[in-house]
Amino acid sequence: MKASDQYHKWVEWSDEDHIYIVKCPDVMTGIHGDDPIRLYSELCDVVDEVIQHFVSEGRPLPRPRIRPMQEVL
């Protein structure tokens, strides 16, 4: 399992902006565009790069906080 696999990633459509937005909130805000499959792949690459940066700096990885079906209070 890759370190990035522990972080929830999702794709959503923005009716307001008429674009797809992909997010990984525990690691970064997100990116947007018109091809959800390409965007998801790019997001995974960026998350891997962010994790590599954390490791190279000797910083701990962010704790995964977002989970699918997590109860919202």
Walk through the language-model features, giving the residues of each:
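A short, exposed loop/beta-hairpin motif centered on an aromatic-Gly-Thr core
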Residues: 24-38
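Short aromatic-glycine-(Arg/Gly/Cys) micro-motifs in beta-strand/loop hairpins
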Residues: 11-26
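Short, charged, surface-exposed hinge/linker loops at domain edges
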Residues: 1-8, 17, 37, 41-73
